[in-house]
């Protein structure tokens, strides 16, 4: 805010100095009120789906995808469009029947009135019961499957009989019932939820069931003595319900990937030692305390079902109850079976139902209990066995456990983490529990302690820098208030409904920015105090006398005066820093990706609110500190104060040596630094723009955790197993081409809300019934088949190009001699193409309906989409035009149909891929050809557009384009700020060159670290500009404001004053980012790495490259300096600059606080630069015109209340001034 250098702001300085409590309380009340309103009126952010918002909106492809989504939503059974006209007619008939029933309630005969009423009542009760127990029915089906038995017992079976291998015994002696009586408990319609019965039962029926269960259990225990020898005995007893509860592994169950470790890590898992180690490992998995609460139990006991694993299948094959009993012969037996049956599995002659449905073309031993299929498909990697090779090598094996994937497994996952699933030979390297989003949501909150730790470190740095715990506390509160205010403006004022988790990354950034502003303000405050004491001295270090009162001073040194000077410099300096950073964030709003757009707005708003608090809350807090801690100074300092002073002296000496070393290296070796950093910048540019380049992501899966996390390892290994390959291998999935007419490619939804897709907009010019349109559609379908991207598809594809099917439909005879009814089909018969519009509109719905009635027809998305039009009378039908048609009539009126949209679909010969270049070539070739075709289309069909499976490609294309746009906008904003505040074209060019090379080096380092241009990386690149430009901005401005216009002297002047604060800012922000690298989630780690890299690179380039450039070719004596009339006028008003002078100190109690007293003691020590802007002086002395102006409205009795005499002996510290 440049207005702080204006005389009109004196009232504000007066308020800060005289009424700081009022300012602090007012701001606190306002901030707390805003935060409460935001939390009460707005829902708390939901991070259950971290990838929500990672989509493109507003682009050409994005609008088409949104319109396509809205079209699909509108064509479902609840929308206004229908692919099958019969569905629309059926709904119309139902609605009319409902109306007629209400208009004529007594049309039925009275004799059936009570009968129908009772029947309707029973039907209603049955429907209600069916609805209530729909979920239970699914469980009962599985339950009955496990308890299945033959429909009637064999006559030669005894009373106690084991039927089948399902584990169900029937006790005819006790129950004395039919074969189905023993299954009576399974027919209950109880409401069962995870083993809890929530309904009431009849007492007698309950007692009977209990007796039945007891008798059944008695027989189960007796059955333990039944013979179990022989593989051919299919009726042998298995534990309760079979070895695996009569079920097979499925993807919906939790599963673990096992790998061999140890000295024999390269050996195959498929040997006796490997299987025994896996057996032990699965026991570790199932023995955690909470496992029994989540596992799928056997239906008749509380025992958990066995895990589906390779050792368990080997034990079942060997007819052993435990996998610990396996021998080498058992492993060999399984090996022989798998080798002999592999060819049938590889040739797709087996599936998961071979033991139930006799359709598998494989030998019986290969189908028995699905051992072969389950082992090869689920439990071993796809390279385990190779065709025509008797050698097997198993690198990865899978263990499935009977625990369904759910977000409720988080406690169980933590127990597995504590157990460490590993033994001497094998370990679990990956797992899939369906917990990715839930765990990420938890870690997003639990890792906040890292943010707090980083904030604590920054606040500790502020404490050491300021020496005031009060200022440190108020600075921390200011940062918290800035976040709360930003959320208020984001959610309430700007009405953003979506809050992505990436917005939380702004917390890390604002901690560093807020601390930098505190450093800046306190630095200027210290320098102002130092300059005042050095100019108003009556005591030397060799003599000591009483300090004079304020009445005896020639110039009254008021708190208001000090505040005015500090604010005039600090407010403008903080404004420049905040402007560049907020501008870089707001530039991200130009992105078409929802999450990036929201992050840019929130992060930019946080920076703005932080700036507002730093020019209101922080000055008032400093004013309170000067009042609150003003005490009488004593010459007898306690030991703690002496230690602090000694520590400060050591730090001061180190800083002095550090600054002198850097200054001498730049002044003496400027050409060497230019050569080194210039070469690094050129090399970085090659890395960024040529090789390897900033690669686009090639995985649609967005990584949430570190690469070594079990969930992320599973994402990289899952394609090693056959059951995952159909979902991940796209070699058989070809890109579909959807050509759409009748719908505008418009997205009128909220681009900042991923749940808002707007409405479907129709093309009013669309009309497919005209003769030119019919001819063009037919020619278009024929032209598509001649293109190189078209794939010839076998089978019936009737709806893909509906016009061809309609032509065949219209060729039929009007009266078929083979039809006994001899129904006249006019006008939909014996017609010549192209058809008359009214005939086309009338017959098209019939043609489509007949096609849907075909048994071999499989409905898709292609074809015309019908909507209901206003009902017309019979005599109005001949006057209908456009896309209207009619099919049936009731009460003498027609129900016309409108062809509101048209979709023509073909399959291309391009396989789906996540590689950007491949899909880009496909999209551009099809799009270019289609646009050329539309130029020859009649006007009513020129509004068509093409779309396909382009969602991920759209994100890739947007990232590559929008990131470049955001960089250009941020760089342009930075250049504008530099021109405005340096007022020198050459300095601005040098600074922009430095920032550009800093960005190149930052991005190059990130590329070498393996980063790809994904969502977070795009944000990081644009944010780096705002963070990197600050250091260059400070160096450039102070070079321009140097009191000496000669190049070498100006360079040395800047280095002696800027190095310290920039090092402090870079260190605090970089270390705060370094702390975030200890997080468990990837976004926190990446933002930490980014902050560390950008701080190091930008500081080194600003200090060594820019200052070396200014040392060698910097402007001097006003060369290429812009002349602004207003600034020239201000510059002529003052020409005094801050100079160090020997310390002769005079002070009043108002200024002798922990802050000011430290300044007194360090008056002769090294004083860094002032972050001043737009002024010809770094610190103006309060004398003459400025002093009189600042005190014009201040009553002199204001100072009298703070007057106290002090006597102290000060020690002179060595100065670092040259």
From Swiss-Prot:
Pfam families: Sterol-sensing (PF12349). It is a multi-pass membrane protein. Residues 104-124 have a biased composition (Basic residues). Keywords: Developmental protein, Glycoprotein, Membrane, Transmembrane, Transmembrane helix. One of its GO terms (cellular component) is plasma membrane. Residues 430-624 form the SSD domain. Disruption phenotype: Death during embryogenesis with a strong segment-polarity phenotype. It is found in: Membrane. Residues 99-135 are annotated as: Disordered. Coiled coil: none annotated. Signal peptide: none annotated. One of its GO terms (biological process) is wing disc pattern formation. Changing residue 1030 to N: Loss of function. It comes from the Eukaryota. The chain crosses the membrane at residues 21-41, 443-463, 473-493, 504-524, 570-590, 598-618, 670-690, 975-995, 996-1016, 1019-1039, 1058-1078, 1087-1107. Glycans are attached at residues 127, 176, 197, 264, 319, 388, 767, 883, 891. Belongs to the dispatched family. Segment polarity protein which functions in hedgehog (Hh) signaling. Regulates the trafficking and the release of cholesterol-modified hedgehog protein from cells of the posterior compartment (P cells) and is hence required for the effective production of the Hh signal. This is Protein dispatched. It comes from Drosophila melanogaster (Fruit fly).
């Amino acid at each position: 805010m440049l207005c702080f250098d204006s005389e009109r702001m004196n009232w504000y300085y007066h308020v800060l100095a005289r009424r700081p409590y009022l300012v602090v309380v007012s701001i606190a009340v306002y901030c707390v009120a805003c935060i409460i309103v935001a939390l009460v009126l707005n829902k708390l952010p939901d991070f259950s789906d971290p990838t929500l918002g990672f989509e493109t909106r507003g682009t050409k492809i994005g609008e088409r995808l949104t319109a396509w989504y809205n079209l699909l939503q509108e064509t479902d059974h609840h929308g206004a469009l229908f692919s099958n006209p019969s569905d629309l007619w059926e709904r119309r008939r139902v609605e009319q029947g409902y109306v007629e029933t209400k208009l004529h309630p007594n049309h039925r005969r009275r004799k059936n009135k009570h009968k129908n009423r009772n029947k309707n009542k029973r039907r209603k009760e049955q429907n209600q019961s069916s609805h209530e127990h729909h979920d239970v029915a699914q469980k009962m089906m599985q339950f009955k499957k496990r308890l299945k038995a033959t429909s009637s017992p064999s006559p030669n079976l005894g009373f106690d009989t084991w039927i089948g291998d399902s584990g169900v015994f029937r006790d005819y002696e006790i129950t004395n019932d039919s074969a189905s009586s023993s299954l009576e408990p399974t027919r209950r319609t109880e409401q069962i939820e995870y083993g809890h019965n929530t309904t009431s039962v009849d007492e007698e029926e309950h007692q009977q069931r209990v007796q039945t269960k007891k008798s059944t259990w008695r027989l189960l225990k007796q059955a333990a003595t039944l013979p179990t020898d022989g593989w051919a005995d299919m009726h042998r007893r298995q534990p309760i319900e079979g070895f695996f509860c009569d079920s097979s592994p499925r993807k919906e169950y939790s599963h673990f990937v096992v790998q061999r470790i140890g000295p024999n890590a390269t050996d195959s898992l498929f040997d006796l030692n490997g299987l025994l180690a896996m057996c032990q490992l699965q026991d570790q998995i199932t023995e955690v305390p909470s496992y029994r609460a989540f596992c799928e139990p056997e239906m008749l006991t509380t025992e958990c079902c066995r895990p589906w694993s390779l050792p368990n299948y080997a034990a079942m094959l060997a007819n052993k109850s435990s996998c610990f009993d396996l021998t080498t012969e058992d492993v060999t037996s399984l090996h022989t079976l798998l080798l002999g049956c592999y060819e049938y599995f590889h040739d797709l002659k087996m599936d998961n139902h071979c033991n139930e449905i006799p359709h598998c073309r494989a030998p019986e031993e290969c189908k028995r209990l699905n051992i072969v299929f389950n082992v090869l498909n689920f439990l071993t990697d796809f390279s385990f066995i190779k065709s025509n090779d008797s050698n097997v090598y198993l690198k990865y094996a899978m263990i499935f456990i009977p625990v369904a994937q759910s977000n409720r497994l988080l406690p169980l996952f933590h127990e597995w983490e504590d157990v460490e699933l590993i033994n001497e030979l094998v370990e679990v390297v990956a797992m899939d529990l369906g917990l990715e989003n839930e765990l990420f949501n938890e870690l997003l909150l639990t890792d906040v302690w890292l943010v707090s730790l980083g904030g604590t470190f920054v606040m500790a740095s502020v404490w050491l820098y300021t020496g005031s715990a009060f200022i440190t506390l108020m600075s921390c509160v200011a940062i918290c208030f800035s976040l709360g205010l930003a959320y208020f403006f984001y959610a309430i004022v700007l009405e953003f409904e979506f809050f992505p988790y990436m917005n939380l990354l702004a917390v890390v950034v604002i901690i560093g920015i807020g601390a930098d502003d505190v450093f800046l303000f306190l630095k200027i405050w210290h320098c102002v105090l130092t300059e005042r004491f050095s100019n108003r001295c009556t005591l030397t270090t060799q003599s000591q006398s009483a300090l004079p009162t304020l009445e005896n001073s020639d110039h009254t040194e008021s708190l208001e005066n000090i505040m005015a000077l500090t604010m005039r410099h600090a407010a403008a300096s903080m404004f420049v820093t905040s402007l560049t950073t907020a501008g870089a964030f707001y530039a991200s709003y130009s992105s078409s990706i929802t999450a990036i757009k929201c992050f840019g707005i929130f992060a930019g708003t946080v920076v703005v609110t932080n700036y507002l608090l730093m020019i209101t809350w922080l000055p008032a807090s400093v004013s309170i500190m000067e009042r609150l801690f003003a005490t009488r100074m004593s010459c007898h300092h306690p030991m703690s104060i002496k230690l602090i002073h000694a520590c400060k002296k050591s730090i001061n000496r180190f800083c002095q040596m550090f600054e002198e070393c850097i200054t001498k290296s730049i002044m003496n070796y400027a050409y060497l630094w230019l050569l080194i950093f210039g070469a690094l910048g050129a090399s970085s540019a090659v890395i960024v723009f040529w090789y390897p380049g900033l690669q686009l992501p090639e995985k649609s899966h967005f990584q949430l955790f570190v690469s070594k996390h079990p969930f992320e390892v599973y994402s990289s290994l899952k394609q090693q197993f056959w059951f995952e390959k159909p979902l991940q291998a796209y070699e058989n999935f070809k890109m579909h081409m959807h050509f759409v007419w009748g719908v505008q490619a418009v997205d009128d939804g909220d681009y900042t809300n991923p749940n808002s897709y707007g409405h479907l907009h129709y093309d009013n010019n669309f009309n497919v019934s005209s003769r030119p349109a019919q001819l063009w559609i037919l020619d278009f379908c024929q032209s598509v088949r001649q293109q190189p991207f078209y794939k010839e598809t076998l089978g019936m594809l009737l709806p893909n190009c509906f016009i061809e099917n309609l032509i065949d439909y219209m060729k039929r005879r009007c009266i078929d001699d083979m039809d006994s009814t001899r129904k006249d089909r006019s006008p939909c018969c014996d017609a010549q193409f192209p058809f008359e519009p009214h005939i086309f509109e009338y017959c098209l719905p019939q043609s489509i309906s007949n096609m849907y009635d075909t048994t071999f027809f499989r409905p898709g998305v292609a074809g015309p989409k019908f909507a209901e039009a206003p009902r017309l009378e019979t005599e109005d039908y001949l006057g209908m035009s456009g896309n209207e048609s009619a099919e049936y009539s009731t009460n003498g009126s027609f129900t016309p149909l409108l062809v509101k949209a048209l979709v023509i679909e073909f399959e291309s010969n391009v396989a789906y891929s996540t590689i950007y270049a491949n899909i880009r070539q496909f999209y551009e070739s099809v799009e270019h050809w289609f646009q050329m075709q539309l130029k020859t289309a009649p006007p009513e069909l020129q509004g068509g557009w093409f779309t396909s499976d382009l969602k991920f490609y759209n994100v890739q294309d947007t990232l590559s384009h929008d990131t470049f746009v955001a960089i250009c906008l941020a760089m342009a904003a930075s250049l504008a700020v530099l021109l405005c505040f340096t007022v020198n074209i050459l300095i601005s060019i040098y600074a922009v060159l430095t920032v550009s090379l800093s960005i190149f080096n930052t991005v190059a380092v990130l590329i070498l670290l393996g980063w790809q241009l994904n969502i977070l990386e795009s944000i990081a690149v644009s944010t780096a500009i705002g963070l990197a430009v600050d250091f260059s901005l400070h160096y450039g401005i102070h070079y321009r404001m140097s009191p000496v216009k000669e190049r070498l002297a100006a360079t040395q002047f800047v280095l002696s004053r800027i190095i310290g604060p920039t090092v402090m800012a870079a260190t605090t922000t970089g270390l705060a980012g370094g702390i975030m690298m200890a997080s468990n989630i990837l976004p926190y780690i990446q933002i930490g790495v980014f902050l560390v890299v950008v701080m190091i690179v930008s500081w080194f380039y600003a200090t060594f490259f820019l200052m070396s450039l200014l040392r060698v070719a910097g402007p001097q004596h006003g060369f290429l300096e812009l002349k602004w009339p207003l600034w020239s006028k201000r510059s002529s008003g003052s020409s005094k600059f801050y100079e160090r002078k020997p310390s002769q100190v005079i002070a009043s109690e108002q200024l002798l606080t922990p802050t000011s007293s430290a300044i007194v003691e360090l008056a002769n020590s090294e004083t860094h630069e002032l972050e001043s802007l737009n002024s010809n002086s770094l610190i103006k002395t309060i004398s003459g015109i400025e002093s009189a102006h600042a005190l014009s409205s201040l009553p002199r009795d204001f100072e009298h209340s703070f007057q106290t005499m002090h006597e102290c002996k000060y020690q002179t510290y060595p100065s670092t001034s040259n």
